[in-house]
Structure formats: structure tokens, C-alpha cells
Amino acid sequence: MAITPGKTLDVTLPKDFLSILDWSPADLEKCLDVTGSLKRDRFLGRQAPTANRLSGQHVAMLFEKPSLRTRVTFEIAVRELGGDIIEPKLTATFGDREAAADVAKSLERWVTAVVIRTFAQERLDEFARATTTLHVINALSDTEHPCQALADIFTLQEYWQSFRNRTIAFIGDGNNVATSLAHATVKLGLTIHIASPSGFNLPDSVVDNVTRIAKKGASIKLFSDPWAAVNSVDAVYTDAWTSMGQEPEAKARRSVFLPYQVNTALMAKAKPDAIFMHCLPAHRGDEVTDEVMDAATSVVFDQAENRLHLSLIHI
């Protein structure tokens, strides 16, 4: 991918975006720098340097799960780049009606890129392995949410300028969002604390990977006590207690996660200027209270906005 805002910025990134693990720290830093340039151009009213980059090209969106921020921002990005969007109606779970590899080999004859939101990372990986020409983007799977993680670290960079000596705490389910956030933060030098109830911890394999890829000075620390996890941190992050597809477990999950609610008392344990983050949608009154969501230190809608600026990089 080559992008030319104001002055020439040549940025070469891996063909696919399936996991933060696939990107080097240098890739992440390049992505953040170019995104910042694109965002500045937008607010200064400059013509987008990426305009018409997809002219005459098509992007397919395969979504098994509902989506607001991911779908809208990718659709806007494709249109701003001059491309067309193809949204096949999925009548069965992606990869069930026919092999994911066969879907990939068909789509590569028609489209330039495919944005996939799926219940299974394995199907996404199978799809990507089957094509050498399609640009495949993970718009969320059961194990990772790399697009969200990029928006998160870009938002942190906007507020902090530097990641040096910064710590973020993730409170809640050790899920796909927590996984990608951990991958991204330690690659860029942050320390991350993750507090989860027993049985909902980050998988051991993820912890091993995070430890392996951590930049010098960065680390991951696991907690069962959310109060200890947020002590003197620079940012507090949470996510829904019940993810899509887990609705039958909602009542049981709520009873387990209630002590992990992010409220004003918990935020008071963090640094006085600590920011609050959430990938949305938020369930107010469950994982976070209205007071925290609507506080001046909440950056949740900045995160949502930045999904758009990052989508221009992904496509």
C-alpha cells in the first residue's frame, strides 16, 4: 500500500490483516503515523490523498455477526477511496455452505479485498491461505479484533503522544478484544494489566505470545482483583460481559462479572487523569456506569471515530 498525503509517505504493510501478531512494531508505528496524517488532512479540509485509490475496484464484506462501527466505517472508507461495496447475503455460517477456501478462490476473480467478521478465526485463516491476491481483513473473530486494537492504540497516542512508562488496565473477560489489545500494547512498549474472574482469563497461549513479543520495558500482568489491576494506571478499558453468541449465558455471566464493573470508585484508584476506554457497544449499568461512560476522561467516542481513519489504511 502506498499513500501520498501532502508529502509522499510510502507505507508497505503485510497483504492481510488477520492478527496484530502478523505486524511488526515498525508496521504498527507506520500505520499510526499515516493515520495521523490522514486525520489531519480531513480536519483541515484537504483532499484525501487516498481518493480514488480503489476506483473501478470492488470490496466484499462477509459479516456473520451484527456490526455498527465496523460496518459503517469500512463502508465509508471504501466509498471515499472510490470503490464499490459487495455484500453477499450469508444464508449459512461462513464456510459451512461451502469451504472457506472455495469462497476465497471465487471472490478473488471479482474483488480486490474482503472484510470478514466471523465466529471462527480458523475459517478466516483458511480463507486467507487460499488466496494470494485478495487483501483479507479480520473485522472480528472469536479470538481477535485487530482493527479495534489499532484504533485503541491510535487513540492512546493522540492523548499521550508517547507510550513510554504508560500502563493500561483491561477489566473483564479475557476475550478477543483483550487479546488484540495486549498484542498491540506490548509491541509498542506499554505495560498491560488484565483482571478477569476465574475461568474467564486470557488463554495461556495468548499470555505466552504477549510475553514473547513484548518490547523491552513492556510486560503483561494478570490479576483476579480489579482494584489491584487499576492501581495508578494511565487508562482503564472494559468490554461487554456477554459477547455475540453468548446470550444464553448472560445471566450467569452478570453474576460473575459484577465485581468487575468499572465505576467511579474503581476509576478513582487509577491516576487522576486516567482515561476510560470501551470498544462499544456498551451495556450501561453492567460493565460500566453512566458516570464513567459520560465523564470528561472517557474517550470511547474518540475510539469509535478513529475506526474510520484506520479503515482507510486497512483497505
Segments (PLM) and residue ranges:
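Positively charged, low-complexity intrinsically disordered leader regions
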Residues: A2-V72, I76
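Phosphate/diphosphate ligand-binding glycine-rich loop within oxidoreductases
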Residues: R46-Q157, R284
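Phosphate-coordination loops involved in phosphoryl transfer and adenosine-cofactor binding
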Residues: L54-V59, R164-R166, D273
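Glycine-rich phosphate/diphosphate-binding loop of Rossmann-like nucleotide-binding domains
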Residues: E64-T73, W160-S232
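A short, gly/pro- and small-residue-rich
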Residues: R123-S141, P248-A270, A296-T297
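Rossmann-like adenosine-cofactor binding region
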Residues: T211-D290
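Rossmann-like dinucleotide-binding domain for NAD(H)/NADP(H)
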Residues: D273-A274, A282-L310
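Conserved small/polar residues in nucleotide/adenosyl-binding loops
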Residues: I313-I315
